[in-house]
Amino acid sequence: MHHEAPLYEFLGLTFNLANVLMITITSVIVFIIAVAATRNLSMKPTGMQNFLEWVVDFVKGIIKSNMDWKTGGRFHLLGMTLIMYIFVANMLGLPFSIVIDGKLWWKSPTADPVITLTLAIMVVALSHYYGIKLRGFQEYAKGFVSPMWILFPLKIIEEFANTLTLGLRLYGNIYAGEILLALLAGGLATGVGGTIAAIIPTIAWQAFSIFVGAIQAFIFTMLTMVYMAHKVSHDH
């Protein structure tokens, strides 16, 4: 179901207040998780510390599968931040949505292409930055004309394609999930018959959406490290 976004103009710029609200809430939740997991560290981790250490090892495995740890270790915190932030963002719109005066205030921030494409642009821009920083501009530039200079236009197109697919893949999966949940929720509100018919599919789809949200967070982080490896590793 389509609802208008709460827009606000400031200094000639238009802001989506729902996006501002939801990315702020996502950031706060991730921050709270990080603080709770590291507040009372022990040699025998339990609870939240155990979870965070699992995330640390999981992201480390992603990085080491794409580049050597000496090079990739500097991206460890980036990978952890991305996978946790995107997973939490993907989950926020699953339990419910909040619509006030026809404006959608509560949703998954990753169900908006502006957010996902911004994340994708940030990741691709960082890959170019570190490519120049770690390899030097000359070696970095050679990557666009090797093995043949005639491939240069295709390499440029590839960079734009990588950015678009990285952002739109995440957006498409999360947005489609929320649309279907909204349709199923509409079935729940059509009476006893609609409730009985829709309740099992709704629960099943919410469970599947949790799985999809986790997979999309993993894919985004994995592709981030793939793009980083292509720019910073000499063997790519």
From Swiss-Prot:
Q: Which GO terms describe its cellular component?
A: plasma membrane; proton-transporting ATP synthase complex
Q: Which UniProt keywords apply?
A: ATP synthesis, Cell membrane, CF(0), Hydrogen ion transport, Ion transport, Membrane, Transmembrane, Transmembrane helix, Transport
Q: Which residues form a coiled coil?
A: none
Lineage, top-rank taxon, reads: Bacteria
Q: Where are the transmembrane segments?
A: 17-37, 80-100, 114-134, 179-199, 203-223
Q: Name one Pfam family in it.
A: ATP-synt_A
Q: Which InterPro entries has this protein been placed in?
A: ATP_syn_F0_a_bact/chloroplast, ATP_synth_F0_asu, ATP_synth_F0_asu_AS, F0_ATP_A_sf
Q: Where in the cell is it found?
A: Cell membrane
A molecular function GO annotation: proton-transporting ATP synthase activity, rotational mechanism
The UniProt entry's GO biological process terms, in alphabetical order, are: proton motive force-driven plasma membrane ATP synthesis
Q: How does it sit in the membrane?
A: Multi-pass membrane protein
Q: Identify the NCBIfam families for this entry.
A: ATP_synt_6_or_A, PRK05815.1-4
Q: How does it assemble?
A: F-type ATPases have 2 components, CF(1) - the catalytic core - and CF(0) - the membrane proton channel. CF(1) has five subunits: alpha(3), beta(3), gamma(1), delta(1), epsilon(1). CF(0) has three main subunits: a(1), b(2) and c(9-12). The alpha and beta chains form an alternating ring which encloses part of the gamma chain. CF(1) is attached to CF(0) by a central stalk formed by the gamma and epsilon chains, while a peripheral stalk is formed by the delta and b chains.
Q: What does it do?
A: Key component of the proton channel; it plays a direct role in the translocation of protons across the membrane.
What family does the entry list?
Belongs to the ATPase A chain family.
This protein's name: ATP synthase subunit a
Query: Origin organism of this chain?
Result: Geobacillus sp. (strain WCH70)
